Structures are given as structure tokens and as C-alpha cells.
Amino acid sequence: MSVLRILALLAATAAALPAQAKPVLHGAATENGIRWQSCLNSGFQRWFDEPPPPGLRCGYLEVPLAYATPPAHAAQAGEQTVRLALTLLPATGPKKGSVVMISGGPGLPGINPYLGNDGHVARLRKSYDIIGYDPRGVGQSTPKISCQVAEGDETPSPDDNDVAGAENQTRTLIAACIKQTGADVLQHIGTDEAVNDLNAIRHALGEPGLTAVAYSYGTKVAALYAERFPKKTRALVLDGVVDLAEDDFTQRLNQERGFQQSFLRFAAYCGKTDSCQLGGGANQALQRYHALLRKLHEQPFVTAAGYEISADDVLTVTRSLLLWPERWHELATVLRQLDAGIAGQQVSDLIDESYSPDADDALNVITCADVANPTADPQLLRRQRQEINIAAMYAHYLPLHEYPLEMCDLWPYRGKDRPHTPVASAALPPLLFVAQRYDPTTPYRNAQVMAAAFKSPLITRERDGHTLVLNGIDSCVDESVVDYLLAPKKPRHDKTCR
């Protein structure tokens, strides 16, 4: 399973918006290029799995496909454009501004951001609209990233250690991306453009300075925005922090080390409960987990409903549920049931929850638009792939002798990322960083070095987990976050929440 797939599990995933927004008229209202309408209108029905709250507004913003230098706020006549999908949850009282929610991934939709239903969120919503948006290429924004391989072009799944077969399958997928999405779009779909999109959204909202909350990969967008537009920044919260100084290899290596640490902490949790068969120490936990994966690799489990569960399915669910300790009991149940051969609907539902072909396509394409280097030494890349895979021993259940090149290794267009230690402009106000001590996928150290670079305070939560701000998980964290968003100029210091 490609490590890129793991990154799709990053960050704040979408859920239903709170329903306590004030009702608004169903007619349209235009705001600097965004034509807001009620999300109950028929044109937006496909945006939501469930009916949206009556007060939620939906709209689009046209931005350039390729930004000029310096970037313009809006598309010019005759040039190719991207249409960003946005939502607005109105403030419950007199409005003072807007808070833009920046989703993770890359490639996760953001029009339906999850907010806790508690006093801290209510205090923020009293005076601030909440803005969600799908990044370019994602969700309801167009053109949409698609890498669907046409019928008849599929290649057979390669056997274990079939490097040539795996790389041929990846080349087929890349060809489908180019055919379905377009070469011109693929070369303007990365984080560099996402930063300019964020500034265009700020301008369209009529905000002199951006106020935003960013999760996981979204913190990369936010940090680069702070560097590029310091005078147009009001307040930025970065939760689950990406280190701008890390190249792709270093980031992925550290992520795998983080997942390995979280697996061992999950195994320790298992040792304290009778409901998990991984108890008994780290080595025993690894042996039992590997034994289960090897069994499923040789013979996938088939539920009574005919649902097939493979070893890769279990790895995907494991990585997903390791992100949030509140769900470790579900992971324990999955592993226990599969080990006993009695897995049912709960297990298949969790697997379905962890898969999203659209998110996978967006993740891969946006990542490659950032990091691909067509002239890199293939042998160096293979050695790096090996080091990345070995770093997470819990997932290393099969002996691999060679490591195929992955999608970004074979991507034909050079990525625009330039890893660097950020330098905070004197014009930039303080940001606010949030991190959890045992975050599996954006290691705690990231937040430390980024907060230092931006000369900004860091809130440390001494727990496991990945992203939590405004989700109703920790009152200590959310109180400080809302205080900052309401009064960002007030002096603040580092804080620890336990």
C-alpha cells in the first residue's frame, strides 16, 4: 500500500455543521465575487449527504488557474479559471468578521467543517461567520481532480515484489490523471496556488486581514500564507503542524516513525484491557498483529454479507483509527473480531469509512504537484522508499526485497515546493500553534520549530491524537484558541493542557 494513501487520513474530516445558525433569505446576495445563496436551493443538493442547516449559505468564487506575479485577487477576462466552492455559516449575533477553516489532506473537502457544540464555539460564532471551502481540484470545486482509469486500460494487480508490474500500474494511473484532469490543470493544482486562493477568498470576504483555523496539511497553506501576505494576516491558528523545512522524504519518514510510536502506545492501551488481543508487551503485540495481517494477506476474510477484508484494508483502518485515541476501542474490537474470524458489519463499515477514491486522487495529485522531481536518482528514491517503510515496523509484515517507485517519483512535472525555515516578517502578527505530544502524523517537534520560527506561542496538549481545535475535545485548548481569535493582539505565552 502506498504511503501516500496514509496522508489522506490526515486532519479534520468533514461532519455535519451545527444547526443553530440564524435563518436567512433564500435569495442570493453577492459579496465581492461570491454570490451567496441558501444551501437548501436545488443547485447545491449534491454538496451534502444530509440536508444542511437552514441558515447555511453556499457560493462559488472564480479564481485564476495560473496566478500572475504578483497574484491578482480574481480571474481576468479570457483566462482559464478555477471555481472554488464555499459555505458561510452566519454569526449568531452582530458580525465582526469571518473565520476561514482550512482543511487537511491534502485533498480533503472543507465545505462542511466540523465544529463542536459547546460554549467556546458559541462564543466565537456570536460575532464571526464560519467559512468553509473545497480547495481547488477537490470536492465541489471545479475542475475536479480525477484519475479514473478507463475500462480496458486497467493493469492487473502486481504480485509481491513485482517492481516492474507495480511501476507499470502507477504509470497507467498517471496517464489517467493527465487524460481525465488535464496537463494544464495538473501543473497548477498544488500548495503554491492554494495559498493564493486563500488570499482571494480573504479579499472576496472583504476582510483586510485573514482570520483562519488550519488543520494538518492546511497548516502548510496557512504558514506559507503568513510568509507571503504578512500585512494581510489578522489571526491564524495552526493545529497539527507541518514543518516547512522538511522535504518530502524527511516528512514521510518522520510520519512513519510517529505512527510506529502510536501503534506501540495503542498496544500499551491494549495491555490494560481484556477486549484487545494485542496485549502483553510491544514485541508480542507486533507479532500478533503481523500474524493477523499475514493470514489475511494469504486468505482475505469474507463476511457473511460477502464483504472481502484484506490485510491492506486492516492497515488502512489501523492508521485511520490510530489518529484519534477516542477511537482506539473501535480498533481493538476490529482486531479482536478479525482474529476470531467473526468480523461483521462494524468492520466493513469502518473500512468503507477509511476509503475515498476522490480523496486518494486529490491527495496523490496535489502532493506530486508539490514534491515531484523528474530528474531525481531512481536508486536514491528506492533506498528512501525502503527506509520509509522500515520506519513503521508494525506495518512491515511482509519481507520486501525491492521497493517500486511511487506516483510522485514517476510524475512528469516538477513540483513547486521549496523546503525552507520560515522567516517571520516584522509586519506579521503573532500566530497560534497547537500540538499534541503524541501526534502520529504531524510530530510534536514540528510545532516547536515552527512556533519558534514565527516567534509565536504554542499550546501543547499532553495527549495522543491528531488535530482537535474547536471540535469540543479539550476545553483548555479551545478556550485559549477562541480567546486568541477574538483578540489576537493580546500578548500570549506558551501553554500546556493536560
Task: Please tell me what each predicted stretch does.
Residues F301-T316, L323-R327, S354-D361:
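Structural motif
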Residues V242-Q260, V334-L335, A343-S356:
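Flexible "cap/lid" loop of the alpha/beta hydrolase fold
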Residues L335, D339-A340, G344-Q384:
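Long, low-complexity segments enriched in small/aliphatic residues
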Residues M1-L7:
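Bacterial N-terminal signal peptides that target proteins for export
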Residues L17-A21:
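Sec/Tat signal peptide C-region and signal peptidase I cleavage site
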Residues D184-V185, R252-L253, V317-L321, S354-Y355:
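Second-shell loop/turn segments in exported
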Residues L7-A15:
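Bacterial N-terminal signal peptides
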